[in-house]
């Protein structure tokens, strides 16, 4: 038996990069709400007093981009310049063009049946699942995400009146390894850095974070006298949001996925409609991995899929059960082939990916969420 430490982080909805993810997905949702067949590739950048959206959108929808952007920023809680950003006064720049006709003719133009729609680009995507938590997500990532969600909840409901929208969490867990099996033993270290108002003391911040956030989220069995806490360790975090750091869409792809576990193909999710396999392929890979682990076929599972632009059928499917599989990887690949149609149009149909449900995926994680709109989290009963 051996042991090791593993760490995952997360950020709140008010982090500059996460602002951008949410704005990009708010634009996507606004298009899909009027035209479910919208083709959207929307990036966002932000800095002090400014949000810029840029990209390629082909849609029948009539979208007020200024309104969509400001509403997304308002929802996060940036409603006063004292917080580092104000949805009412920020400058919104729009640089949106139509999707390239070269891409359109190769992917979807003239293709009536879902089975014929090609992938919007080449690339490889990964999905991961593990039985160490009920959500079949890694414990490090689960706890980092839940700390963020609790902190955000307490800020919005006024319990933490001193809290501001921008914050980060990080959790280190000690694992033991026996053969191929890994088991989380204890939480080694917790880091929380949260933006705050001018008046609150560090003593109150640290007490509130420990009592109201950490103890509400982390099961007592994982905390002990040796757990290390770094709570606002810099000593001051008044300047936050886009005033403190610039933000870009797609800069938090590991937080969006599995916190460093498994693997990542590099493509971001937010701002992309489901013909973009960076998103739909990654959702499908999670759907597969979670279904395999839920069926007891493995304790842990990594799935890779790859695509070529304009081609419907995936080029490859790969599975790794880390030595925990109850069947061979070849047998599991056959099960995948018999149960999942990974052509992009079929994924859009089976996972209902033309609905305007993506803004809420852009904060708190795309995976491991208990929400019926996250269809890729619904375990599929497998035909063996």
Curated annotation (Swiss-Prot):
<dbReference type="Pfam" id="PF00438">
    <property type="entry name" value="S-AdoMet_synt_N"/>
</dbReference>
<feature type="binding site" description="in other chain">
    <location>
        <position position="245"/>
    </location>
    <ligand>
        <name>ATP</name>
    </ligand>
</feature>
<feature type="binding site" description="in other chain">
    <location>
        <position position="276"/>
    </location>
    <ligand>
        <name>L-methionine</name>
    </ligand>
</feature>
<comment type="function">
    <text>Catalyzes the formation of S-adenosylmethionine from methionine and ATP. The reaction comprises two steps that are both catalyzed by the same enzyme: formation of S-adenosylmethionine (AdoMet) and triphosphate, and subsequent hydrolysis of the triphosphate.</text>
</comment>
<dbReference type="InterPro" id="IPR022636">
    <property type="entry name" value="S-AdoMet_synthetase_sfam"/>
</dbReference>
<dbReference type="InterPro" id="IPR022629">
    <property type="entry name" value="S-AdoMet_synt_central"/>
</dbReference>
<comment type="similarity">
    <text>Belongs to the AdoMet synthase family.</text>
</comment>
<dbReference type="GO" id="GO:0006555">
    <property type="term" value="P:methionine metabolic process"/>
</dbReference>
<dbReference type="GO" id="GO:0004478">
    <property type="term" value="F:methionine adenosyltransferase activity"/>
</dbReference>
<feature type="binding site" description="in other chain">
    <location>
        <position position="99"/>
    </location>
    <ligand>
        <name>L-methionine</name>
    </ligand>
</feature>
<feature type="binding site">
    <location>
        <position position="276"/>
    </location>
    <ligand>
        <name>ATP</name>
    </ligand>
</feature>
<dbReference type="GO" id="GO:0048269">
    <property type="term" value="C:methionine adenosyltransferase complex"/>
</dbReference>
<dbReference type="GO" id="GO:0005829">
    <property type="term" value="C:cytosol"/>
</dbReference>
<feature type="binding site" description="in other chain">
    <location>
        <position position="15"/>
    </location>
    <ligand>
        <name>ATP</name>
    </ligand>
</feature>
<protein>
    <recommendedName>
        <fullName>S-adenosylmethionine synthase</fullName>
        <ecNumber>2.5.1.6</ecNumber>
    </recommendedName>
</protein>
<dbReference type="GO" id="GO:0005524">
    <property type="term" value="F:ATP binding"/>
</dbReference>
<feature type="binding site">
    <location>
        <position position="43"/>
    </location>
    <ligand>
        <name>K(+)</name>
    </ligand>
</feature>
<dbReference type="Pfam" id="PF02772">
    <property type="entry name" value="S-AdoMet_synt_M"/>
</dbReference>
<feature type="binding site">
    <location>
        <position position="272"/>
    </location>
    <ligand>
        <name>ATP</name>
    </ligand>
</feature>
<feature type="binding site">
    <location>
        <position position="245"/>
    </location>
    <ligand>
        <name>L-methionine</name>
    </ligand>
</feature>
<comment type="pathway">
    <text>Amino-acid biosynthesis; S-adenosyl-L-methionine biosynthesis; S-adenosyl-L-methionine from L-methionine: step 1/1.</text>
</comment>
<feature type="binding site">
    <location>
        <position position="9"/>
    </location>
    <ligand>
        <name>Mg(2+)</name>
    </ligand>
</feature>
<keyword id="KW-0460">Magnesium</keyword>
<keyword id="KW-0479">Metal-binding</keyword>
<dbReference type="GO" id="GO:0006730">
    <property type="term" value="P:one-carbon metabolic process"/>
</dbReference>
<dbReference type="InterPro" id="IPR022631">
    <property type="entry name" value="ADOMET_SYNTHASE_CS"/>
</dbReference>
<keyword id="KW-0547">Nucleotide-binding</keyword>
<dbReference type="GO" id="GO:0031012">
    <property type="term" value="C:extracellular matrix"/>
</dbReference>
<keyword id="KW-0630">Potassium</keyword>
<dbReference type="GO" id="GO:0045335">
    <property type="term" value="C:phagocytic vesicle"/>
</dbReference>
<dbReference type="GO" id="GO:0006556">
    <property type="term" value="P:S-adenosylmethionine biosynthetic process"/>
</dbReference>
<dbReference type="GO" id="GO:0046872">
    <property type="term" value="F:metal ion binding"/>
</dbReference>
<feature type="binding site">
    <location>
        <position position="268"/>
    </location>
    <ligand>
        <name>ATP</name>
    </ligand>
</feature>
<dbReference type="Pfam" id="PF02773">
    <property type="entry name" value="S-AdoMet_synt_C"/>
</dbReference>
<feature type="binding site" description="in other chain">
    <location>
        <begin position="166"/>
        <end position="168"/>
    </location>
    <ligand>
        <name>ATP</name>
    </ligand>
</feature>
<keyword id="KW-0808">Transferase</keyword>
<dbReference type="InterPro" id="IPR022628">
    <property type="entry name" value="S-AdoMet_synt_N"/>
</dbReference>
<feature type="binding site" description="in other chain">
    <location>
        <begin position="234"/>
        <end position="237"/>
    </location>
    <ligand>
        <name>ATP</name>
    </ligand>
</feature>
<keyword id="KW-0067">ATP-binding</keyword>
<dbReference type="InterPro" id="IPR022630">
    <property type="entry name" value="S-AdoMet_synt_C"/>
</dbReference>
<dbReference type="InterPro" id="IPR002133">
    <property type="entry name" value="S-AdoMet_synthetase"/>
</dbReference>
<feature type="binding site" description="in other chain">
    <location>
        <begin position="251"/>
        <end position="252"/>
    </location>
    <ligand>
        <name>ATP</name>
    </ligand>
</feature>
């Amino acid at each position: 038996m051996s042991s090791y430490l593993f760490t995952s982080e997360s950020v709140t909805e008010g982090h500059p990069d996460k602002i951008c993810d949410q704005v990009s997905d708010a634009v996507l949702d606004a298009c899909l709400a009027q035209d479910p067949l919208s083709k959207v590739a929307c990036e966002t950048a932000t800095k002090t007093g400014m949000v810029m959206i840029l990209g390629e959108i082909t849609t029948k929808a009539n979208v007020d981009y200024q309104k969509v952007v400001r509403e997304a920023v308002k929802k996060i809680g940036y409603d006063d310049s004292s917080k580092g950003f104000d949805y009412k006064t920020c400058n919104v720049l729009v640089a949106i063009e139509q999707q390239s006709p070269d891409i359109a003719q190769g992917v979807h133009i003239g293709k009536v049946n879902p089975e014929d729609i090609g992938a919007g680009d080449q690339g490889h995507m990964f999905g991961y699942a593990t039985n160490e938590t009920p959500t079949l997500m890694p414990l490090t990532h689960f706890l980092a995400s839940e700390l963020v969600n609790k902190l955000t909840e307490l800020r919005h409901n006024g319990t933490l009146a001193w809290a501001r929208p921008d914050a980060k969490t990080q959790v280190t867990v000690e694992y033991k390894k026996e053969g191929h099996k890994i088991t989380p033993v204890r939480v080694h270290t917790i880091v929380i850095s949260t933006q705050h108002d001018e008046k609150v003391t560090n003593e109150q911040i640290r007490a509130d974070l420990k009592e109201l956030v950490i103890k509400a989220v982390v099961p007592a069995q994982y905390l002990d006298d040796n757990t290390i806490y770094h709570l606002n360790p810099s000593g001051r975090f008044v300047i936050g949001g886009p005033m403190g750091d610039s933000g870009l869409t797609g800069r938090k792809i590991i937080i969006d996925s599995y916190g460093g576990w498994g693997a990542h193909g590099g493509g971001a999710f937010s701002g992309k409609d489901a013909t973009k396999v960076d998103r739909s392929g990654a959702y499908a890979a999670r759907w597969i991995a979670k279904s395999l682990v839920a069926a007891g076929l493995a304790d842990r599972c990594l799935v890779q899929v790859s695509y070529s632009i304009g081609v419907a059928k995936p080029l490859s499917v790969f599975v790794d059960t880390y030595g925990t599989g109850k069947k061979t990887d070849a047998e599991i690949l056959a099960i995948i082939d018999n149960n999942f149609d990974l052509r992009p149009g079929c994924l859009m149909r089976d996972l209902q990916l033309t609905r305007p449900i993506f803004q809420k995926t852009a904060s708190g994680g795309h995976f491991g969420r208990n929400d019926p709109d996250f269809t890729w989290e619904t375990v599929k009963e497998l035909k063996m």
